[in-house]
Regions:
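Extracellular beta-strand-rich, repetitive "passenger/adhesive" scaffolds
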Residues: 45-70, 78-271
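Sec/Tat signal peptide C-region and signal peptidase I cleavage site
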Residues: 40-44
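Bacterial Sec-dependent N-terminal signal peptides
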Residues: 1-34
């Protein structure tokens, strides 16, 4: 701690003052508490043990959650960063516009809310569960794993090299992008939600509800997709769809696209 030394007219380390005078005046003690409080409010707290609740990470600040540390109900504002790794855990973090949450090596983030302009990155063995993308973005790559993400209107999830997503729910206006080396399994597409499978990307066991769309681009692969009434699967030239089940939905296969072992049930249509 630092204190004001009236004789020196300067701030000094408290331990030095104690050695020189043998005590610290009550006035100086009050100053110590005031300075400590100000520092605590000005900077994000790194967390390596215990639980820190309701913290705020502001512009230019980085909060690191690691080891056995946990945070609850943190808020990451514009320009702020929350890094979760090495056994750290966060619950119910809110990431606002231009804020970021990075979930890395053995880190876990549960029930994060990512608002418009915010981003959550999941990589290097990091795990997330029940992230809500309320207009924000989630990028999953390099052995990152995201489960039970919900993508609302304006939100987007990108799964790339080595990234895994399972049980994502895409609501109307939301979008999932599966690019090279990424895998999405058990995705549900609702309303006007969209799943785009790009070259080298793979989607397994997608369920498409009314108004939802799965686009399989050149080099992309979709397997065991279920297309329900008024849902769409579109397979472009060079794309491949295997084992699609049309339960009242539609499959459109462009010239050069492949549809293998499709099953067409009542109300289903393949063109």
């Amino acid at each position: 701690s630092i204190v004001w030394n009236s004789s020196r007219q300067a701030w000094v380390v408290a331990s030095e003052l104690a050695r020189g005078r043998g005590f610290v005046l009550a006035k100086n003690t009050l100053m110590v508490l005031t300075v400590a409080s100000a520092v605590g409010n000005a900077f994000a707290q790194n967390v390596s043990s215990g639980v820190v609740s309701n913290g705020v990470v502001s512009s230019g600040e980085t909060q690191v959650v690691y080891s056995n540390g946990q945070t609850s109900n943190a808020t990451v504002n514009s320009g702020g960063i929350q890094n979760v790794n090495n056994g750290g855990k966060t619950t119910s973090t809110t990431v606002n516009s231009s804020g970021a949450q990075n979930v890395g090596s053995s880190g876990t983030a549960i029930s994060t809310i990512v608002n418009s302009g915010g981003i959550q990155r999941v990589s290097s063995g990091g795990v997330t569960s029940a992230t809500n993308l309320s207009g924000g973005a989630q990028n999953i790559y390099n052995l990152g794993h995201a489960s039970n993400t919900v993508i609302f209107s304006g939100g987007n999830q990108t799964i790339s090299s080595g990234g895994i997503s399972d049980h994502t729910n895409i609501s109307s206006g939301g979008q999932q992008r599966v690019s090279s080396g990424g895998t999405a399994s058990n995705t549900t597409i609702n309303g006007s939600g969209v799943q785009n499978i790009l070259s080298g990307g793979s989607a397994v066991s997608t369920h498409i509800s009314a108004g939802g769309t799965q686009n399989v681009s050149s080099g992309g692969n979709a397997s065991d997709t279920v297309v329900n009434t008024s849902g769409f699967q579109r397979v472009s030239a060079g794309g491949t769809a295997t084992g699609t089940r049309l339960s009242g939905g539609n499959q459109n296969v462009s010239s050069g696209g492949k549809a293998i072992d499709a099953e067409v049930y009542s109300g289903g249509k393949q063109t």
